[in-house]
Amino acid sequence: MRNSKKLIYRSVRIGLSMLLLSAVTVAAWPQTVPDFSGLWKQDNDRCQPKRSGDVTLHIEHHDPELTIETLISFGSQISRHAVQKYTTDGKVSVSTGADGDEFRTSVVWKDSSLVFAIEEHEDGRILHSQETWSIIENGATLQRTRERTNGEKQILFYRR
């Protein structure tokens, strides 16, 4: 009887040790991050507030490298084009936007979203904002939430 209790306790200890080891292994397993690569078209009707114009993003994402090509057109007006290169390790990149403004941007991961800290130099002013980019709706939609002192905007793009 005494030996059977020892055997039971030993089995329980071994089982708990294995459970603890597997939990630590899962917690230490590298988390996968979404791939933002693709061709994305702005969904004007679903944006908050609603937007106009034709905006297309061509994103190449090979983490930590992130390249975003933006094409903007408003009917018959001249279109705007810009290419920005970032890294997702928090290093600041300097680029020129489609509107000609200078941007100083750092990008980091927060869970499965990209967070952009943006400093825009426009007409002698410096504007600070933050954008959070997430892939939603089973990979069909890119959601950009822009936070500025004058409010928050949500810009949605669908995958083409």
Where are the regions that the model predicts?
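Bacterial N-terminal signal peptides that target proteins for export
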Residues: 3-18
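Hydrophobic small-molecule pocket/channel-lining residues, especially in calycin-type beta-barrels
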Residues: 29-160
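Basic/polar N-terminal segments that are highly enriched at the extreme N-terminus
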Residues: 2-5, 29-31
